[in-house]
Curated annotation (Swiss-Prot):
This is Aromatic-L-amino-acid decarboxylase. Its EC number is 4.1.1.28. Substrate binds at residues 82, 192. Homodimer. InterPro entries: Aromatic_deC, PyrdxlP-dep_de-COase, PyrdxlP-dep_Trfase, PyrdxlP-dep_Trfase_major, PyrdxlP-dep_Trfase_small, Pyridoxal-P_BS. GO terms for molecular function: 5-hydroxy-L-tryptophan decarboxylase activity; L-dopa decarboxylase activity; pyridoxal phosphate binding. GO terms for cellular component: cytoplasm. It comes from the Eukaryota. It catalyses: L-dopa + H(+) = dopamine + CO2; 5-hydroxy-L-tryptophan + H(+) = serotonin + CO2. Pyridoxal 5'-phosphate binds at residues 148-149, 246, 300. It comes from Manduca sexta (Tobacco hawkmoth).
């Protein structure tokens, strides 16, 4: 491809992207395809000769878009959001053009240094303590990981490295195997599955502790578990406090947990993957009270802060424990400036890394802090709008207090009736939700996921839910008519059946 073709192709693609995003609400959210749909749409082998770029453009709708789930649609309410914005898309274009692999400072000085500064900018926006920021002149600093799952695992390995070092000093006769068998970490039962996975990958025990009635892990619960394990000869070394659980956006009691961890010198990692973006708004920082007691903190700008995936921001007070855990230093990666600037290969699992800080730089400059704050507040406002619509209908109930851009709700009645309602909602494909279950209670999650969302979209989603419920009730009514027409039993028995099998399911 020559420069002229590149310009033409890029112009056509930017036009296509703009048209796609600005009209995305017109598309069915989830595609009507089955596994294996794509293979028949493309040749069995790669072409021997080059094709024109226009041929590729012509195939995008037929091959790709026919099987895309449209996460940026205002009607997509599943999981948590994945962020998207024009500045971030353009930054990814530049990153792709530079095409550096920034594993050391010398591999691309700008790649490292912009990341250091952007993590300081971002940390200040959140109100993080200076101990986490490189600008403070201390040991602390930030790094961009690929995902919060990586950050959780990296923090666990750092905590493990620190505790192994301490225990070896106290018990030089113990082997690493002896120590590893005694290490134990803790988290909320509602913590993300990646926390459990980090324990498995790290080869250590991880206990999931029961939260209180508001789904929060409390300090007393953690203290009791730690005391019990110490009595049993174990070594507590790591705790994950979740701010905004995946199931219901509950917040652990960070301040209490921090006191317990500090008293026992246990590494405290804060996972604020989704909710952390809201902390750029001062009115939501009460959820992170006690963050100064943490050893590491993580949130995902790529979820809710208009920075495209992947961009997971992590800060550490003492990154040396991470560096020590990952330090493999072959001659071909050494350089004369080692020690003068971070070599981020020591702060992560992979060696290679993209120029991800460009996305932060572009977004923070082209939006500004005030507009990002307005965006977060607007999205939370949409969640409260849906909450009001929901609570105006006596057939529904909230499962969890609405604090961020997530509404957890259910139809009054059995789990089975809610499962059927969700099947009908998602089966039509106009909107898309996912469920969760806490304490054996099944509920639906409606997340505000798109930067294109407006008030009218919330009304559309609410009307679709009510419409699917009405169709479900009509199907129940058809069953009822069939029973009445075919039964020869007494009226009393019919009414009993109706009460037990029809009205009960919908909370009537």
């Amino acid at each position: 491809m020559n420069p002229g073709d590149f310009k033409d192709f890029a112009k056509a693609m930017t036009d296509y992207i703009t048209e796609y995003l600005e009209n995305i609400r017109d598309r069915q959210v989830v595609p009507s395809v089955k596994p294996g749909y794509l293979r028949p749409l493309v040749p069995e082998q790669a072409p021997q000769q080059a094709e024109p770029w226009t041929a590729v453009m012509a195939d995008i709708e037929r091959v790709v878009m026919s099987g895309v789930t449209h996460w940026q649609s205002p009607r997509f309410h599943a999981y948590f959001p994945t962020a998207n914005s024009y500045p971030s898309i353009v930054a990814d274009m530049l990153s792709g053009a530079i095409a550096c692999i920034g594993f050391t400072w010398i591999a691309s000085p700008a790649c490292t240094e912009l990341e250091v500064v952007m993590l300081d900018w971002l940390g200040q926006m959140l109100g993080l303590p200076d101990q986490f920021l490189a600008r403070s002149g201390g040991e602390g600093g930030g790094v961009i990981q690929g995902t919060a799952s990586e950050a959780t695992f990296v923090a666990l390995l750092g905590a493990k490295s620190r505790m192994m070092h301490r225990v070896k000093e106290q018990h030089p006769e113990w082997t690493e195997t002896d120590i590893l068998g005694k290490l134990v970490g803790y988290c909320n039962q509602q913590a993300h599955s990646s926390v459990e996975r980090a324990g498995l990958l790290g080869g250590v025990k991880l206990r999931s502790l029961k939260p209180d009635s508001k789904r929060r892990l409390r300090g007393d619960t953690l203290r009791e578990a730690i005391d019990e394990d110490i009595r049993n000869g174990l070594i507590p070394f790591y705790v994950v406090a979740t701010l905004g659980t995946t199931s219901s956006c509950a917040f652990d009691a960070l301040d209490e947990i921090g006191d317990v961890c500090n008293a026992s010198d246990i590494w405290l990692h804060v996972d604020a993957a989704y909710a952390g973006s809201a902390f750029i708004c001062p009115e939501y920082r009460h959820f992170m009270k006690g963050v100064e007691k943490a050893d590491s903190f993580n949130f995902n700008p790529h979820k809710w802060m208009l920075v495209n995936f992947d961009c997971s921001a992590m800060w550490l007070k003492q990154p040396r424990w991470i560096v020590d855990a990952f330090n493999v230093d072959p001659l071909y990666l050494k350089h004369e400036q080692q020690g003068s600037a971070p070599d981020y290969r020591h702060w992560q699992i992979p060696l290679g890394r993209r120029f991800r800080s460009l996305k932060l730089w572009f977004v923070l400059r082209l939006y500004g802090v005030e507009n990002l704050q307005k965006y977060i507040r607007k999205q939370i406002g949409f969640a409260h709008l849906f909450e009001r619509l929901l609570t105006s209908d006596e057939r529904f109930e909230l499962f969890e207090e609405v604090t961020m851009g997530l509404v957890c709700f259910r139809l009054k009645g059995s789990n089975e009736i809610n499962e059927e309602l969700l099947r009908r909602i998602n089966g039509r494909g106009k909107i898309h939700l996912v469920p969760s279950k806490v304490d054996d209670v099944y509920f639906l999650r409606l997340a505000i996921c798109s930067r294109f969302t407006e008030e009218s979209d919330m009304h559309v989603s609410w009307e679709e839910i009510k419409d699917r419920l009405m169709m479900f009730l009509k199907s129940k009514g058809a069953v009822l008519i069939k029973i009445i027409c075919s039964t020869t039993r007494r009226t009393k028995n019919i009414l009993t059946y109706i009460k037990q099998n029809i009205f009960r399911d919908v909370g009537l």
